[in-house]
From Swiss-Prot:
One of its GO terms (molecular function) is transmembrane transporter activity. Belongs to the SLC35F solute transporter family. The keyword Membrane applies. The modification Phosphoserine is found at residues 5, 22, 25, 28, 372. One of its GO terms (cellular component) is membrane. PANTHER family: DUF914-RELATED, SOLUTE CARRIER FAMILY 35 MEMBER F2. This is Solute carrier family 35 member F2. The modification N-acetylmethionine is found at residue 1. The chain crosses the membrane at residues 39-59, 73-93, 108-126, 136-156, 165-185, 195-215, 227-247, 263-283, 290-310, 314-334. The lineage of its organism: Eukaryota, Metazoa, Chordata, Craniata, Vertebrata.
Length: 375
């Protein structure tokens, strides 16, 4: 075996150092792209929404398991009433085209359909638990994400890159890990009374959520957050109130009211109200799709709280699932999607995710935000 000459050894050393420097610069570039202040802020906002959803799940489960109270429509009705009292009345005192009566005159039927989609999405998902399994609900509820992306493509004219589809796949892989952890931990102990009906309810509910979220993104970016919440509060109160009298009046009559049950209802309503109030703000600076990816962690937060409140069994797969979902969420937020305008429009294309969307740029520059005249 021949010994390496000093000349060749000296030549290989700079090449090795160059390779190390190249790898280091690549890692540094990736780190700067993935861990910017704006992406970290987006992550924090998404997890704030997840905690709101976690609060609604914990209070609902506590009502169901400890007090045998199963009234999802009543709980939703209280939330819609709060939205009505705050945002609908706010619209009533607006002037011009933003006034409540003017909005109703021009677009009442559109907001009726939006309110119906939002109310029934909430109701169908909760009702599905009576028929199918926890695993089915967790997995099939993710069906709303591809539906949301498809609706965003055609309605909002969002254009995705390969990295976005990879990120969504990674997030769904994290959900699969969470479901596997549930099965191993023994939480999947309910076979369901009619799995097919339950699965159909989940798919319908997830699809209606997607419709509601796309409409929400359009309205908060083109019109205003107050208009969306005010109209959802108005029509949600009417629709859920009617449905409440039809499907839950017997369940409500059987409730043995005390201060603990009342406190749980108040806690649920506050969590739901915060979720509805903050979600448009987050969607405005990101997108409906990124928000839905971020709140996939809500079930995991509920599981972590359930370790103490409901004596769930812990599994290391929950930590792995949380990590995988967050990796997918960061990947999605790292690259902005592109929004194409109709051919006849002279408006330049804008991005619709992260810090690059038009709404946030207007906020940062201090310019007034333009409002579209149509929904």
């Amino acid at each position: 075996m021949e010994a390496e000459s000093p000349a060749s050894a000296g030549a290989s050393e700079p090449r090795a150092l160059g390779t190390v420097d190249s790898i280091g610069s690549q890692l540094s570039r990736i780190r700067r792209k993935l861990f910017t202040w704006d992406i970290l802020k987006t992550i924090a906002l998404g997890q704030m929404l997840s905690l709101c959803i976690c609060g609604t799940a914990i209070t609902s489960q506590y009502l169901a398991e400890k007090y045998r109270v199963n009234t999802p429509m009543l709980q939703s009705f209280i939330n819609y009433c709060l939205l009505f009292l705050v945002y609908t009345l706010m619209l009533a005192f607006q002037s011009g085209s933003d006034n409540l009566l003017e909005i109703l005159r021009r677009k009442w039927w559109k907001y009726t359909l939006l309110g119906l989609a939002d109310v029934e999405a909430n109701y169908l998902i909760v009702r599905a638990y009576q028929y199918t399994t926890l695993t089915s609900v967790q997995l099939l509820d993710c069906f709303g994400i591809p539906v949301l992306m498809a609706l965003s493509w055609f309605i909002l004219r969002a254009r995705y890159k390969v990295i976005h589809f990879i990120a969504v796949f990674v997030c769904l892989l994290g959900v699969g890990t969470m479901v596997g952890a549930d099965i191993l931990a023994g939480r999947e102990d309910n076979s369901g009374s009619d799995v097919l009906i339950g699965d159909i309810l989940v798919l319908l509910g997830a699809s209606l959520y997607a419709v509601s979220n796309v409409c929400e993104e359009y309205i908060v970016k083109k019109l205003s957050r107050q208009e969306f919440l005010g109209m959802v509060g108005l029509f949600g109160t009417i629709i859920s109130g009617i449905q409440l009298l039809i499907v839950e009046y017997k369940d409500i009559a059987r409730i043995q009211w005390d201060w603990k049950i009342a406190l749980l209802f108040v806690a649920f309503a506050l969590c739901m109200f915060c979720l509805y109030s903050f979600m448009p703000l987050v969607i405005k600076v990101t997108s409906a799709t990124s928000v839905n990816l971020g709140i996939l962690t809500a079930d995991l937060y509920s599981l972590f709280f359930g370790l103490f409140l409901f004596e769930y069994k812990f599994s290391g797969l929950y930590i792995l699932s949380f990590t995988v979902i967050m990796v997918g969420f960061i990947l999605y937020c790292s690259t902005p999607t592109r929004t194409v305008e109709p051919p006849e429009s002279s408006v330049p294309p804008v991005t619709s995710i992260g810090i690059d969307n038009l709404g946030l740029k207007l906020e940062e520059s201090g310019l007034p935000e333009t409002h579209s005249a149509v929904l």
